[in-house]
A protein has these predicted regions:
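Non-catalytic, surface beta->alpha helical segment in thiol-disulfide oxidoreductase systems
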Residues: 59-81
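Short, charge-rich, low-complexity interaction segments located
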Residues: 42-46
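Thiol-based oxidoreductase modules, predominantly thioredoxin-like and allied folds used
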Residues: 27-41
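Local sequence-structure signature of Cys/Sec-based thiol-disulfide redox active-site neighborhoods
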Residues: 1-27
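Alpha-helical coiled-coil heptad-repeat segments used for dimerization/assembly
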Residues: 17-20, 39, 75
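Structural micro-motif
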Residues: 48-58
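Residues at alpha-helix termini
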Residues: 25, 47-48, 80
């Protein structure tokens, strides 16, 4: 089971980079393309003050990070226990 969902778009370079880093580390996550899932865009907007900024990660505890580094993601996952 993944501890977070990554909201992304196909053209987002930062998203591709973070996905590659997570995959190399063997970190599992769910992925949602906000251009294909309109309700997902609303989630991203709520996490980013009305902006559709990606990548936005939403964790199992309801918190979010926008364009985090791999280290920030690993730290957050560790804090979730």
């Amino acid at each position: 089971m993944s501890s977070f969902t990554m909201y992304t778009t196909p053209w987002c370079g930062y998203c591709h980079r973070l996905k590659s880093q997570l995959d190399r580390e063997g970190i599992s996550y769910d992925i949602v393309d906000i251009e294909q899932v309109p309700d997902a865009a609303l989630i991203v907007e709520q996490a980013n003050g009305g902006n559709q900024t990606v990548p936005t990660l939403v964790y199992s505890d309801g918190t979010a990070q926008t364009n985090p580094s791999l280290a920030q993601v690993k730290e957050k996952i560790a804090s979730l226990g």
